[in-house]
Amino acid sequence: IVGVSDIWNRRRLEGAEFIKAKTGLKVDKWRNNEEMYEKNKIDSVIISTADFQHAIHTVEAAESKKDVYVEKPFAETMDDAILGLNAVKKSKIIFQIGSQRRSGLNYHAANNYIKSGKFGKVVMVEMKWNVNQPDRWRLPSLVKEIKEKDTDWKRYLINRPFEKWSPRKYLEYRLFWPYSSGIPGQWMCHQIDTVHWFTGFNHPRSVVGNGGIYLWKDGRENFDTMTAVFDYGDSENGFQVLYSSRFTNSAGGIQEIYYSNGGELNLKTNKVTPNGGLKANHANKMGMKQNLLDEFKLDEVKSKAITSANTGVDNMTSLHIHNWMKCVRDRKETNGPVEAAYNHSIATIMTTAALRTGLKATFDEKIQQVIVGGKIFKY
């Protein structure tokens, strides 16, 4: 690690001090990315900025020929996603999207099992991400302390419509659209990405959803509770995905369960079981055979998903960073290529469009845009 770039002088200093405390290294401090790239003393960057900035910051890195590890979501609008995708592909940099499930040992086992055909046709997927955290994405003390003069508000906004300085939208951006979609971009994109990975579909055919701010009425604009229903594929190979998430009660925690006619693949227990499979008494009546999966443990080594904001403490994130660093050295494709980032962006933006308009969202392959009510969705 040779330096830290941050437009807020406090975070810039704190970042450098943190690195020194951990490594003993005295690193450079850059006021912005242009200053960092002008010095040209770096080989790669880790982009951990506001959600809506990720794709644009990736473009900057790609144009400077720097390898990238970028946090998810990749983009919150299709225009940004397209820019990021094209920049990475043109530059041929090593790219890793921060979807750390793609480096989890149990997720690789699940992917291999489904693709082997032993699981059978996926007929339904249920996903949850529940916490009880009124403090999640809140930074009230820092909101009181930060001053506009100590950062660069115009640079922060990048391509979003200009509005006057807001310390909450700067620091608590995950609660405010169009700086973040909130739950879809922060959590859902992790889980829906596994659907694309395991099944080979690039994006949903349609998404409907609703939600609201039902409890934490603290001025936020993004929902504290939401449910979305995804339709994938067609009449021959299609299935439904049900996703729900709430900030208001943690029962159920994080769940990802794949269903076939023969049972379930549960990524919370890391087991395949015949739970819910077709039993003989019902099958025989229709001249069919019983269909019950053999029990199967995905992996002896569990890669556990966590609900803490500090994702650096889980082994999936460590494995994912290691995979990126290895690929930077050997110039091979990472576990989280830019196509995966682009595809989870499509699903995320479709969900945001459905939630914010109350309409069914679809995707136009020809123009690569999310459509609601016959119009392209942006903000």
Language-model features, listed with the residues they occupy:
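Short loop/turn motifs at secondary-structure junctions
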Residues: 25-26, 41, 118-121, 200-203
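Short strand-turn motif at the edge of the Rossmann-like AdoMet-binding core
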Residues: 72-74, 98-101, 129, 338
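Extracytoplasmic/secreted proteins, especially bacterial periplasmic and envelope-associated proteins
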Residues: 10-14, 32, 53-60, 79-83, ...
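Solvent-exposed loop/turn segments at secondary-structure junctions
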Residues: 7-11, 51-53, 75-77, 101-104, ...
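Contiguous beta-strand/loop segments that form the cofactor/metal-binding neighborhood of enzyme cores
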Residues: 108-109, 121, 126-130, 135-339, ...
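General small-molecule cofactor/ligand-binding pocket signal
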Residues: 2, 28-30, 96, 208, ...
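N-terminal glycine-/serine-/threonine-rich beta1-alpha1-beta2 phosphate-ribose binding loop
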Residues: 1-70, 82-94
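Rossmann-fold dehydrogenase core element
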Residues: 83-101, 110, 120-125
